[in-house]
Regions:
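Signature of multi-pass transmembrane helix bundles
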Residues: 2-240
């Protein structure tokens, strides 16, 4: 028997009744790669908001006319199928202008456009929240979403959403390395870490980072708006 033969081949034992141990060689990922993966996680979770919001807005324009964008929220909230709106007045270039549609088409178009607008309003918050989730897991979601909302409020847009998502994820991840008392451990991922991370990220955005990031976002928008046709084509080739 092999147990009595000193020259018999030995097989390394595995704890747990023969189940193979998981490979750990792929766990040593650098921080740059880890942040890149988290950003891609945020983008992948943001895409459904883009798809739903963009398509609903386009359907609203198709049904209610392009000018439904100026009155969609008011019409959707103030009127109903039993109280259809007349043509609505909105301001365009300082002059009162009537919408091109009225009645059922205006109301349905306004409902679609309003839903699309509500969906698009979540883009930056979703991007930031799920970047933080990609870095820190569940404790990073709330701080990331709140940081994204602050980014929108201060005008930092997508640049701010990227920054707040990464910040929230890294701060929440650091808090998870702490070793609290046993009686506090159950509250850490659902209360303590989200609370402290939100405070850190929100304070940094409102006090320190918000205005510079908003200026960078404004500069980027102005640069893209001022591009000529040839420059736009070149940028498209570079971006791919």
């Amino acid at each position: 028997a092999a147990t009595q033969d000193p020259k018999a081949q030995r097989v390394a034992g595995v704890a747990g009744g023969g189940a193979a141990a998981p490979a750990t060689g792929g766990g040593n990922i650098g921080w740059g790669k880890r942040i890149q993966q988290a950003v891609m996680t945020g983008v992948s979770y943001m895409i459904p908001f883009v798809a739903a919001g963009g398509l609903l807005t386009a359907l609203g324009f198709l049904i209610g006319g392009y000018d439904v964008a100026f009155v969609s929220s008011d019409v959707a909230l103030k009127f109903s199928l039993w109280n259809l709106p007349d043509a609505q007045t909105y301001q365009l270039a300082g002059a009162d202008t009537l919408t091109s549609h009225a009645g059922l088409s205006l109301y349905i178009g306004a409902v679609f456009a309003a839903l699309g607008s509500f969906g698009m309003n979540f883009l930056v918050a979703a991007l930031s929240g799920y970047i933080a989730f990609g870095l820190a897991g569940r404790p990073g979601i709330a701080p990331g979403f709140i940081g994204g909302a602050v980014s929108v409020a201060v005008g930092a847009g997508f640049i701010g959403g990227l920054v707040t998502g990464i910040l929230a994820g890294l701060v929440a991840l650091w808090f998870t390395t702490l070793r609290p008392p046993r009686w506090l451990a159950g509250l850490m991922p659902v209360v303590i870490i989200p609370l402290l991370t939100t405070l850190v990220v929100g304070a940094l955005m409102l006090i320190l980072l918000g205005r510079p990031l908003a200026a960078a976002m404004t500069g980027l928008q102005n640069w893209l708006t001022s591009m000529t046709g040839a420059s736009a084509v070149l940028l498209g080739i570079i971006v791919g």
